Amino acid sequence: MENEVLRQLEARKSVRVFTDEPVTAEERRASVHAAFMAPTAGNQQLYTILDITDPALRGRMADLCDHQPMIAAAPLCLVFLADCRRWLEAYRMAGAAPRDPGDGDLLLAAADA
């Protein structure tokens, strides 16, 4: 059976060595847009994306993330954070009385991120 999605999943690879070629603004926007199009729990998108451009901060992150120098060398560094504040914003936007996120909501946010 030929299935394009399965073929793409099987052809996927991790890249940890990068060229010096910068990521264009359009490529950056397309990457973030693709992330926002991914399904999330209840379509709540309980995450925030940080675009880390400061070389010193990338170097610090590389150290803190189990000494992975590819983080500092990558031409694009997006950090996905579980963000339960978005849960509260959704309540406010719906005009509903918010409740504090519980343990399960934190797990949903972590899975979304």
Model-derived features with residue positions:
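Acidic, surface-exposed loops and disordered segments
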Residues: M1-A113
